[in-house]
Amino acid sequence: MAKLTVFTPTYNRRYILPKAYEALCRQTSRDFIWLIVDDGSDDGTGEMVQSWIEEARIPIQYHFQQNGGKMRAHNAGVSLCPTELFTCIDSDDYLVDDGVESILEEWESLKEKEHLAGIVAYRGRDPHHTMFGETFPCSGSASVSELYRKGFFGETTLVYRTDILSRYPFPVFEDEKFIPEAVAFDLIDRQYAMHIFTKVLTICEYRGDGLTRSVDKLRENNPKGWLLYYQQRIQDSSASVLRYKYVAHAVCFCWKLKRNPFGEIPASRAEIMAAFPGAFLLRLAGKL
């Protein structure tokens, strides 16, 4: 059985998926499966993937579901994953040619793994350069949130143990289709560290129809998910300017949902009241 699942959630990205497919066909190790969860595409994605399955160049598992958003697709992917390791490669990203081999060799080289949830590595603009020239601020192991607290500002490739991911599914709300990834990953960070691997594993190509280009719209349409994100961030932060920002954002989403901030936000009454001016400014700026 393969050791790694390369998971790609997709929705009407037929035009870009061939790049990810060709990159997987170039892998120096074939010890993986490509799991595609199609979140309701109507652009012929399914027919194209079926043709690749018939080519039999790489093992592909395809699952179609009604459109429910990336987080539901991710939960489905984890539930379908048959391998020890799981990495999510978005449809506008692709693995470097030795990505699978590097992941498996690095993981197998680790002697103590019980405290590890997986591997954190770089995303880059090419196989030799990170997105903005950034480097990890420490070595060995650390939680992902710890890396960012210590000054890391770049993009990461995350490889998780499937058994751990399955215990931390993304919460879903019936009338929403998005929730920040950190809602699940922050919970994992509370219990586990990640092995730090200083190699570019995925090449990132942001596109105009991707989620990262529509953050304001995502915030407007998914207030419950964003409120949960800020609630968790407040729980994990101490007194700081950053904590104040989290509280201000949480106040905004409470107003949006017509909820009482004092009953929803895990902060003192004084902190919440102090964040009201910041919340008003966020609303004036169109950030809810």
PLM region spans:
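Glycine-rich, basic loop-to-helix element that forms the pyrophosphate-binding segment
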Residues: 65-81
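Conserved donor NDP-sugar-binding/catalytic core segment of glycosyltransferases
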Residues: 98-133
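Short aromatic/hydrophobic "clamp" motif used to bind/position activated sugar donors
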Residues: 86
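Catalytic core of nucleotide-sugar-dependent glycosyltransferases
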Residues: 202-207, 214-240
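Short beta-strand/loop segment that forms part of the nucleotide-sugar
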Residues: 32-40, 61-66, 90-91
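Short, well-formed alpha-helical segments that are part of the catalytic scaffolds
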Residues: 12-26
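Conserved nucleotide-sugar donor-binding catalytic segment
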Residues: 125, 131-213
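A conserved acidic beta->alpha catalytic loop
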Residues: 23, 38-48, 90
